[in-house]
């Protein structure tokens, strides 16, 4: 019973988890944050940057192919959201721009991101469906469990793909090694026969 309660509490904590970071951005530089995200997941975020007169910070969210999913210029504070179409590594970049005639100042950037189950408003769902608080918690846990199962399935799939790739690579390396040894043996045999004919022609051996 205690173990079950611990698992429920752990799932509840995960359900409310989010990713918050704060970093410093030097003048005329950019910093990107990357994360692997499953397909068809909603990603939401909030950002805030310290205001420095004359300095500009832009942000852009994109995938590995360079497709822009969200973008905004001259940011100070705001929100963004985008939907991941495929499983990929997505990045959010903050870009500092300072005029040449101005001495740049380091700015602070804070970012809070949520994805998947974390983006759902279960209070709103509970009110719309007239659910009791316990039923809302159970709904949250159900969605979180489904999300965890999907993560494990994806990890298993990637593990199988990596194992297949390793097996194919090992087979190719073995084939190449055998081919190289055969080539070396063939070359050595040819050299022995050539030298034997050469020495016979010079009458150095019979």
UniProtKB/Swiss-Prot annotation:
Position of the signal peptide: 1-20
Domain GOLD: 30-140
This protein's UniProt keywords: Developmental protein, Membrane, Signal, Transmembrane, Transmembrane helix
Pfam families in UniProt: EMP24_GP25L
Domain of life of the native organism: Eukaryota
Stretches of the chain found on the membrane's Lumenal side: 21-172
Consequence recorded when altering residue 106 to V: In strain: MEL11, MEL12, ZBMEL82, ZBMEL131, ZBMEL186, ZBMEL191 and ZBMEL229
Role this protein plays: Eca and bai are essential, though not redundant, for dorsoventral patterning of the embryo. Specifically required during early embryogenesis for the activity of maternal tkv, while the zygotic tkv is not affected.
Name the record gives this protein: Transmembrane emp24 domain-containing protein bai
Protein species of origin: Drosophila melanogaster
Phylogenetic placement of the source organism: Eukaryota, Metazoa, Ecdysozoa, Arthropoda, Hexapoda
């Amino acid at each position: 019973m205690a173990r079950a309660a611990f698992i429920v509490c752990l799932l509840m904590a995960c359900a409310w988890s989010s990713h918050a970071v704060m970093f410093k951005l030097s003048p005329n530089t950019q910093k990107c944050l990357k994360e692997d995200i499953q397909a068809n997941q909603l990603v939401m975020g909030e950002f805030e940057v310290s205001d420095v007169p004359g300095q500009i910070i832009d942000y852009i969210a994109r995938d590995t192919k360079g497709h822009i999913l969200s973008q905004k210029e001259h940011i100070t504070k705001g929100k963004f959201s985008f939907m991941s179409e495929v499983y990929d590594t997505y990045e959010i970049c903050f870009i500092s721009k300072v005029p040449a005639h101005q001495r740049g100042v380091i700015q602070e950037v804070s970012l809070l991101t949520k994805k998947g189950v974390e983006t759902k408003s279960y209070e709103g769902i509970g009110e719309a469906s007239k659910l009791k608080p316990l039923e809302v918690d159970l709904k949250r846990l159900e969605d979180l469990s489904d999300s965890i199962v999907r993560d494990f399935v994806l990890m298993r799939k990637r593990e199988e793909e990596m194992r297949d790739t390793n097996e194919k690579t090992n087979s190719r390396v073995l084939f190449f090694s055998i081919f190289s040894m055969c080539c070396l043996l063939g070359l050595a045999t040819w050299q022995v026969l050539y030298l034997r004919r050469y020495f016979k022609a010079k009458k150095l051996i019979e």
